[in-house]
Structures are given as C-alpha cells and as structure tokens.
Amino acid sequence: MSDKNKYNQTLFLPKTSFSMRAKLPEQEPKTIKFWNEISLLEKLKKQANGKEKFVLHDGPPYANGPIHMGTATNKILKDIINRTMLIEGYNVLFVPGWDCHGLPIEWQIEKKIRNKGKNKDDIPIKEFRQECRNFANKWIEEQKKSFIRVFVMADWKEAYLTMDYEAEATILEEFAKFFLNGSVYRGYKPVMWSPVEKTALAEAEIEYKNIDSSSIYVLFKIEESKNSDFNNANILIWTTTPWTIPGNRGLAFGKELNYCLLELQDSENKEIKGKKIVIASNLVEAVTKTCGIEQYKVLKSFKGKELESIICRHPFENDGYDFEVPLLEANFVDDKEGTGIVHIAPCYGEDDYNLGIENNIKIEDIVEDNGIYKENTPLFAGLHVFKANDVVIKELKARDSLVGVKSYNHSYPHSWRSKKPIIFRTTPQWFISLEKNSLREKAIRSINQTKWIPSSSKNRIESMVVNRPDWCVSRQRSWGVPITIFINKKTKEPLKDKNVMDKIIEDVKKYGSDVWIAGDPYKYLGDDYDPNDYEVVKDILDVWFDSGSTHAFVLEKKNLKWPADLYLEGTDQHRGFFQSSLLEACGTRDTAPYKAVITHGFVLDSNGRKMSKSLGNVVSPEDIIKRSGADVLRLWAALTDYSEDMRIGDEILDNLNDYYRRIRNTFRFILGNIGEQSLPKCIDYNDLEEIDKYILARIYNFHKKRSEAISDFSFHNFYKALFEFCSVDLSAFYFDISKDALYCEGKNSKKRNAKTTILFYLYDFLASWYSPILCHTMEEVWKLFKTQNCESVHLKPYPSINEKWKDDDLLRKWDKLKLIRKAVNSLIEKARSEKKIGSSLELEVYIDTADKEVEKILRNTDMKEICIISGFNLETYDENIKNVLAFEEVGAIKMKIWISKSVNGICLRCWQRCKEINNKNDLCNRCSKVINDVKNISKKDT
C-alpha cells in the first residue's frame, strides 16, 4: 500500500446502498405495489380518523382519451396539496371523479357508427347510449391507471362518475330545485350553435381561432324619410358574415354619433357612381379608401337622431325579401370600425335579437339545425351558410348593392370538439334565469366571500358573472341527463308537479336516465294527467350542469365536507367548472360550494407555444415517465409557478433530471454518514458548534416558509429555495466543511456526533418536506433508514421543531461569513486554475480588515474549518509580503485577502498541513489519537 493510501481504512468514509442510479421508470411501479401490499391508503385513513377534515374537490376530467400534460399537472398539483395537508395532521378526503356525458363522447360513437356505413338514427337510442357508456368506462380505467402511475393518492374505489345512476338522479334533483322555484324557463334566444354537431354549445365548449372572412359593404336603399335630404339616398353597412344578409330585418345607428351624407363622384366601382350614402363621419376616410371611392362630396353632416323613423328596402327586394327594414337606435353602435351603422339579423346575434324584441321585429329563423338555409329561403335554399358567402356577394353585386369587399382576419368561435366554426342562432332553449331568485346577486356575493388564488382570478370570474346572459342548460343531443319536463300542448306551459318529478328521480336512481330517454316517460304522469295533453321534452342537460352539481352528490352524499376547502383547476374553468358550480350551488344553497379556488395556467412547450400534433411539440406525461420517472414529473410541477402558463420540453427536463440528481445526492451523503443500522447519538443544542446551529436555524426558517406556502398553497418558491439549500448550502457548504469531522474525527467524538446530529435532523425534515413530491424516492430512503417505527414514509408524522433553533442574529452572522468564504474560494479557484495548487489544504489564508465587527467574527470562528485550508491569519497587508499566490480586495466587506502555500508538514490521514507532525507515522496529533483509540478499542474487544 502506498503512503498516500496507507490510512484509508482508518477513515470513517460514507457507506450506503442508496445508489445514485435511481432507475425511476423501473423502480417506481415496485413502490406502488408495496403501497398496495401494506394497504397504505387504509392505514392513512385510520391514522387520520377523527381529525379535522380537509377536502379538495376534484373537478372531473373528461373520460374520452388518455391523459395529457394538462390533466396530469392538475392531478399532481392536487396530490401535492393533499399529501402536504395530510402531513399537517388533517383528515384528507380526496374522491376523484370523471365527467362522462356530452358531445365529445357522442362524437366518437357517431364516428364509429359512420365507419360501419350507418348513421346514428339507424341505432336504437338505448344501444347508442350504452355504446357511449362503454366508451367512457374504457377511458376511465385507462386514465385511472395513469393517475395512479404518477402517484395520485385517492379513494379510487369511491370515485364518482357523472353517469352513475345515483349521480344522474342527484343532477335531476338539483335541476328540479331550479325548475320548481320558477328559475327555469323556455326561451327563444340566440345561442352559440354548432351546425356540425347540431346542438347549442356553452362558452366553455368554444375555442377561438383567427380566420379570414369576406367583409362586405352593402347598400340599403332609403324608402321612407321625414327629411327630404335623404330622398334617393342609401344606408351603407358593413358585415363580416355575408350569409346573414338574407336574415336582415333592420339597421342600427347611434343616436349621438356624428354622421354625414356623401355623394359618390368617382369610384373604381362605376355602378355606384352618383349614389348618395349615409356613413359615420369618423369612418369616411377608412371606408372610401377600402372601397376604392376616389372622389366624393359631403352633402350634409348631422347627428344620428336624424336617422330615426327612416325605412329602407332589403337589397334582395322583389326576390322574396319584400319587407321594410327600419333604422333602430341602439347603444351598442360605435364609430370605431365598419360604417357606424350595423346590419341587424335578429336570429343570428344577441344584440340583434334584443334590439329586434325591443322593437317588435319578427324573429324568423331561416337556417336548419345543420347550417343549411331552409327550403323557403328565397335565392339561397339548400345552401350551407358557410358556402353561401360568395353567392350572397354575387347577388348583391348583380343588384348594384355591393360597394366593396375586403378580406378580414379576425378571431372567430369554433367548437372545441369538431374544430369547425359555429354560428349564433336563435332557437327555443331552456334557460336558468340569473335574475329570478337573485341568482346573479348571490353568485357575486359568494365570489367576494371566496379566497381566489391568484387574487387576479377573482376579477375575472366576477366580470364573467356580472356580464353573462342567462344559463342555457338545454342541448339537442342524446348522451346526457334528460330534461324531464312535460309541456302542455294547449297552454305550452311546463308541468310543475313535484310528485311527478320525484317519481322520475326515484326511477333514475334505480335504473338510470334511460328510463326517460329510451323508456316510456308518460307513465310518470300517473292518473292525475292525460298523456294526450302533453308532449315530452327531448333535450338533455348541459354537461356543465352535470359537473356543476358534483358538490351535491360528492361533497354531501359521500359524507365529505360542504363547502369544500378548495377547488383547483385550469384557468379555462372560470367559464366552466368554477362558474357552473358557483351558479348551481348559489341557486340551490345560496352560497358557493368552495371556500378557496386555485387557478393554474396551461402547459405549453419550452418556447411558450400551445402543444399540438401539427406542430410536433406534444410532450406526454407517459413519455416523461418512461424517460425520467414520475418523481421528476412531480418535481417539475412543484418547482413551476402554476399561477402562470407552465413550460416543459427536453431542455427543461434535462435540467430537472439534474435537479433530481442533486437532491438524491443530498440524501446519499446523509445516509452514508449517519449509517443505516441505528439512530445516531444526538448532541444537545447547547453543545453544538455555531455552524451546526446555523443549519438548525435554516431548518427552522424553512419550517416557517413551508407554513407560509401552505397558507396560500404556493409551493414553488418554497421548493425552489429548498433545492438551492440542498445543492448550495448543504452540498457545497455544510457537507463539504463537515467531511473532515465525519471522516477523520473519532467515531464517537463530540465533534463527529454533532455533525451526525445535524444530518439526522436534516434527514427527518427533508424526508417530510420532499415526500409530497418525490413520493417514490422518499419511500426508497425511508426503507433504508427509519427515524420512527412506520412502514412507509407517508405514515411518518411531521418532526417537531425546537424554538431554540430560531436565531436570526446567527443567520446574519453566517451570511456574512459565507460571503467571506466565497471571496476566499475565488482566490483558491484562481490558484487551482493556474495550477499553482492541487488542494485547498495546501494553503494558508490571510485577511486584513478595517471592519471591527468582521474582525471580531473572524477571530471567533474556525476559518481553517470553514474554508477547508491549513492555516488562517489576521494580518496587516504589505505589498512586500513574499510568496503570495493570489490577492483580492473586497470592497463590500472592507477587507484584503491573500493566500500562500503552507510550509508545514502533511498529515497522511487528513491531508492537513500541521506544525506538529509525528515523524514515525506522518500523522497530526488529532489523527494519531484517533488511531490509538481505535487500536485500544480493538484490544479490549479481543
């Protein structure tokens, strides 16, 4: 054995079976199996029984495909919170759920039927609905496996499904409350309509895309006016939906806007030369430029009120459109875009509809459910509205009514399922009034009583509720909970009889909602009513009413807690789950079903783009798990600010893998040095050295930071700081400094025991702090070293904090010492890079400072230990000092630092340079004593 290695066997080097090779993708499933074998969930329930409940209500994901990064992130965030609250001592009750009804599933089944050469109407309704149910069940099982794989801790056996009979019955119970208290009415209103899916859509089922449309400028000839100035003049309108011109029944103007009457003198379109047009004064320049009008004369300027009582003719008059088109005053008209006069098609826009109703304009729908003009629509019968634009333009041009056409790029609503554009269409629908029974008022009051995280989300949902229309709760589809209403054929009034409703609900609870849709609903009328007097409503409920009712059949009926402590969903749920739950609960219970609401952002790629197959930038949770493991995915979720949109990609994952390795290395160092066989002998706080107390003070502060993070469920800052603590303050500072004591001091020495005491506390707290995130990894370390008699780290109680550890003065002192150490290290690294030294132990460090406080700190601190050097001296700097390897002046701390090589001998065991080296064994006094003590112990043992 060489002199260099002759004493290696006398060192107390770290030993652990905790490998740096985590092999997470293959090891994590074994941990899940272990949890199942020990019935972990049941033990957690038993341990928490009788404690205060904490309920995070799970907003149901849709059961129509594999989970994606959004759904995985959502469930992981919920799980981190639940596991944290469990450690805090709460009885955490998490019941997962799924949204099972609705259009996306119907769409898939219809597609399957079409692939067989059939259509939906060829299939019995009961069979069709069973296919939908089977499809949902398939994806529920697949998603459940995926959620379990990312360690979501939940009561899977108690999971709720909106298609369960009990759930369907409760949804009907909730609807009946609105219906019987007069909040439900049948109205003829404009709704967002999908021609492809032939149904009304909710705002939450809409996505907006930029499209190019043909915007057109159209003339409406003035027929009647009290003012002769308008004789033979025309009103000019602008629209981006030419297909709605056949539905025009009026024109809207702003009473206080400024208008002018122009005479067109020269134009690229010779057919309009000489015509007189009315247009908003502020828009003359823009319109004439767009339409190629080169010369014009202003005949008159006037206020909009002069347009009152004017009657126009439809551009397609004499071709079936022989009706009056009145000018109507409206407060929504402005002069920022268009012509300052709006074409009104009452059936195809909300403002149009409301203005038509106010002025007794006939509301006539000329479009079928599938988006095709009805047979009695002159000129355009049988055409699809989206294919009619060019035909409408052609017909207008033929009648000299077209002034200009311009391509117009704008944001337009599309169905999120079919990806096709929707239309606004006035149809008979069922609505819940937001004014009846003060529903809007109750909702706004509840919003202000709820804690919103981030706080900006409160303004967002409040604005939505203040401005939203009545809730359209009917859908013209098959897969959902039916609207169980009978309509009197003569009076057209719905039958409001609680006994009838109760009978229906009772049967739905037993047999499901097929009893209405596929059975004989008239049997529920009993002997009290003649079935011949009634017709059955065939619509189903909006699926958002389903999910909005989950609080009733989950929080209440599963004996959880009402209201829930927390709802947590993506930012899109302000118009979805958050709002439907709010309105449903306020309408039936006068208050929100939640105390606090957390909103998280969308998951984007590393460049901040939305993930899509077309861009090839989709990152799936399954791919991350196969590549890096679920613990790494959870670490990403914990370190990311969820209040904003979150990014993920290859580079981000590479960084996360590095973060994970550093955390793992922290535990490897701890396990290697405290041993895995027994608990270390802990030293009393008063007997610890300052540097050890400093680490305890840091633990105390992290304990407080964690409490603050829990109060507003904002964990990313805590875990970022904790990661930095592990990688910088521990690995690169405390662990590095402690190696000499751990490896070279006597095994039972006070100094070494002080270090293992700190490592023990670090292990105990870090395991608790990281267990909600790195669920598998913490289980792995716990199996190797248990601080308490618990089968699983997740059964481990949170360690107790000692108030003695709080020491802000000590923290400030050591923050200053760390700055000094950093300055010293920069000199050491400079000397090392210049190949003047190999190890810092070859050096002695000198400091000259005028700062008395700093001088005092340095005199009372073992700087040799802190800087891992062989000598430290406080001296006055002189430029003539010899053998200086490197020099630095640190202005911030008022000091000069220089280093030189030590001239002392080397201890071949600890490698420190010491004045007293034993010539016989080349050891320093400390190492000689340690070896002698070991020899004496060995002799006694023999």
Where do the PLM segments sit?
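Short cysteine-rich clusters marking metal-coordination/redox-active sites
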Residues: 194, 415, 488, 526-530, ...
